[in-house]
């Protein structure tokens, strides 16, 4: 069996694009092989900052042959009255590269069997340049020379080998060959690959570890060894450390780890500042002692070997110290002012030119936060903390530290608030109001912080909607979808049952033109996030649609609950029977909605009485408070009497009084069904 190698040689690709580009190359190659019916043993990906590559092992000699049956026109349309082939039949034959002599007739139609022979592998692989390499898409492009062609970075060389033979094609003016490039500084620039199987070893001899996973494991091992040697504690399994490890891995081809040191005096700066300076700005790994206390050392990785490593360490230490000097200055300078001083500056900080200032945004957030807190029955101390947090929670935006390190907004707000004597609960809320910072990030831990986070995001959505600055398509420049996701997740994980419609309606009415949004549109926007989150959790589309639809209930926690309840019970043996019975009630009830006043004296059969006995004592509001599962269980218990009812009862009887009474009885059940959703959207399987 043969091996095929494709390498795309590039100018330095930004670290954050390397892994996604490698993944895209693999996916496009996989689709290419499937489309051409060419089987391989494995698809091995490789990448460095200067190259993307894929190796196909055990490549079949040729693609699989294919026989397809094509159905043509009916026999009546294929032949005329004289038994001659019609234009429709002749056109069908031409389209398939055949003649009517090749026709078969069965099942009232003419058929053709189209056989496609397998194609030699090399004749297929020569197309990979046009169908894979040239078709790749990126979030960032570069144009070079006089080409209209755009790519992540300029293509400088191409290697395409089928075993030992070059597969000839070109992209722009770059022709494939067998010559790659070694490490930019450590080896001879040009490296000849004699056979596709030699790719990894040839590059390793040229100081390039081309396998990204092997390279990452080497970095991890080197860092761990240095930490162990110095009795330091190094955390590499957090999300932040994993992201840094991925980034560092994508800026080196031959990794060599090293340790550096900085003056102990800088440890007086908050840990978050030191860590941000090291991790975010210098790509350094911080270390601690075994009690978790930050140490005046760091670990980093160079793209090279150990030669002149002392010079590299000294250079990195010098750059870090310059950063820390700035941080120390800002930290001391910020403490010479008060929160009130910073808030005066916040009053002039623009939130959005169509909406107003950050200070005005904070005031509106305070109104919303109080409304939410009161609906959650916060005590007096909690309400006081919510009020104070809302008054000051953006003050740190005007500090020198956040101006220099904008990643620290909220974090420095909490730290400074404590230094300035604020209640710890208020200080924590300042940090937490940004949470969650991603679709899967942690929500605010404290109740004060969570209320502030929800209120801050709600005001942003309402005011941006009022200013007609809503997301369109994939475009969401103000992060409103992320904000809505944060609202839903916070309410869900806190298990806070809040009817959003009355809260937002009253808020919009009280805040004038700046908040004069279509609240129905705002709520639908938030419900879209409910749909996405539950779909992402693996719930069926029809169950999500059913659970979100037809409800005046704008408590997102309850809506998520009923979606999950429908999903859980969809596996029950009687789910089909239950849903069919309930949707039959629904279809009839919505045609003639009446009040719930049922007169038992108008019953004409035992089935009506049985259904009445099963439903007359139902307390709708109580069942809803108990939760969606209680609603479903109650409705499922009605399946048998409903079935019996419809077998024995004609709802649309001629007697108007009896008919209306029957609709009233069905309407009792319909109102309860509505608390579970629009069950007609459920696809019964």
Curated annotation (Swiss-Prot):
Pfam families: tRNA_synt_2f
InterPro entries: Gly-tRNA-synth_bsu (IPR015944), Gly-tRNA-synth_heterodimer (IPR006194)
GO cellular component: cytosol
Catalytic activity: tRNA(Gly) + glycine + ATP = glycyl-tRNA(Gly) + AMP + diphosphate
Disulfide bonds: none
GO biological process, one term: glycyl-tRNA aminoacylation
Keyword presence, Ubl conjugation: no
A molecular function GO annotation: glycine-tRNA ligase activity
Subcellular location: Cytoplasm
Enzyme class at the top of the EC tree: ligase
Major localisation: cytoplasm
Keywords in alphabetical order: Aminoacyl-tRNA synthetase, ATP-binding, Cytoplasm, Ligase, Nucleotide-binding, Protein biosynthesis
PROSITE patterns xref list: AA_TRNA_LIGASE_II_GLYAB
Enzyme Commission number, as recorded: 6.1.1.14
Entry similarity comment: Belongs to the class-II aminoacyl-tRNA synthetase family.
Description of how the protein assembles with itself and partners: Tetramer of two alpha and two beta subunits.
Name used for this protein in its record: Glycine--tRNA ligase beta subunit
Lineage: Bacteria, Bacillati, Bacillota, Bacilli, Lactobacillales
Gene from which the chain derives: glyS
């Amino acid at each position: 069996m043969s091996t095929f190698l494709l390498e795309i040689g590039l100018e330095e690709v930004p670290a954050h694009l390397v892994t996604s580009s490698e993944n895209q190359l693999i996916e496009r190659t996989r689709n290419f092989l499937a489309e051409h019916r060419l089987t391989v043993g494995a698809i091995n990906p490789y990448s460095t900052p200067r190259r993307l590559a894929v190796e196909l092992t055990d490549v079949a000699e040729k693609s699989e042959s294919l026989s397809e049956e094509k159905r043509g026109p009916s026999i009546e349309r294929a032949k005329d009255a004289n038994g001659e082939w019609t234009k429709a039949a002749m056109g069908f034959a031409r389209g398939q590269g055949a003649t009517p002599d090749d026709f078969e007739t069965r099942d009232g139609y003419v058929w053709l069997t189209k056989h496609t022979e397998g194609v030699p592998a090399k004749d297929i692989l020569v197309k990979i340049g046009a169908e894979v390499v040239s078709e790749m898409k990126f979030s960032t492009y570069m144009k070079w020379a006089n080409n209209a062609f755009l790519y992540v970075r300029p293509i400088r060389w191409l290697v395409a080998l089928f075993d030992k033979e070059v597969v000839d094609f070109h992209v722009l003016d770059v022709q494939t060959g067998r010559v790659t490039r070694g490490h930019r500084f450590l080896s001879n620039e040009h490296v000849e690959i004699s056979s596709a199987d030699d790719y990894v070893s040839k590059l390793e001899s040229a100081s390039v570890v081309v396998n990204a996973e092997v390279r990452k494991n080497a970095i991890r091992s080197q860092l761990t060894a240095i930490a162990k040697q110095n009795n330091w504690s190094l955390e590499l399994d957090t999300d932040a450390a994993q992201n840094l490890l991925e980034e560092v891995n994508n800026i080196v081809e031959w990794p060599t780890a090293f340790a550096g040191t900085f003056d102990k005096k800088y440890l007086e700066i908050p840990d978050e500042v030191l860590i941000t300076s090291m991790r975010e700005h210098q790509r350094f790994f911080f270390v601690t002692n075994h009690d978790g206390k930050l140490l005046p050392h760091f670990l980093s990785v160079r793209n090279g070997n150990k030669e002149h490593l002392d010079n590299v360490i000294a250079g990195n230490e010098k750059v870090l110290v310059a950063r820390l000097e700035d941080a120390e200055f800002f930290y001391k300078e910020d403490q010479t002012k008060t929160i009130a001083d910073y808030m005066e500056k916040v009053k002039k900080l623009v939130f959005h030119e169509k909406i107003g200032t950050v200070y005005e945004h904070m005031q509106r957030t305070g109104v919303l936060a109080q409304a939410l807190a009161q609906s959650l029955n916060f005590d007096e101390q909690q309400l006081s903390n919510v009020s104070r947090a809302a008054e000051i929670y953006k003050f740190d935006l005007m500090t020198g530290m956040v101006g220099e390190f904008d990643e620290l907004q909220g974090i420095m707000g909490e730290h400074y608030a404590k230094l300035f004597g604020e209640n710890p609960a208020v200080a924590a809320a300042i940090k937490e109001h940004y949470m969650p910072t991603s679709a899967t990030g942690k929500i605010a831990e404290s109740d004060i912080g969570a209320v502030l986070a929800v209120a801050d995001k709600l005001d942003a959505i309402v005011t941006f909607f009022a200013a007609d600055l809503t997301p369109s398509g994939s475009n969401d420049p103000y992060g409103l979808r992320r904000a809505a996701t944060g609202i839903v997740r916070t309410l869900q994980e806190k298990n806070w049952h809040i009817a959003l419609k009355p809260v937002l309606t009253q808020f919009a009415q009280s805040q004038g033109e700046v908040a004069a949004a279509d609240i129905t549109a705002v709520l639908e926007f938030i419900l879209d996030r409910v749909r996405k989150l539950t779909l992402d959790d693996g719930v069926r589309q029809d169950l999500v649609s059913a659970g979100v639809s037809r409800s005046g209930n704008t408590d997102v926690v309850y809506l998520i609950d009923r979606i999950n309840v429908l999903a859980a019970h969809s596996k029950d043996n009687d789910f089909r029977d239950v849903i069919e019975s309930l949707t039959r009630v629904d279809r009839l009830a919505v045609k003639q909605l009446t009040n719930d006043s049922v007169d038992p004296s108008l019953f004409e059969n035992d089935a009506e009485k049985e259904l009445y006995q099963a439903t007359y004592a139902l307390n709708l509001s109580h069942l809803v408070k108990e939760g969606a599962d209680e609603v479903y269980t109650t409705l499922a218990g009605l399946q048998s009497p409903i079935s019996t009812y419809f077998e024995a009862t004609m709802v649309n009887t001629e007697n108007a009084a009896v008919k209306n009474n029957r609709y009233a009885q069905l309407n009792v059940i319909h109102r309860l069904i509505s608390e579970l959703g629009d069950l007609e959207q459920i696809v019964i399987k």
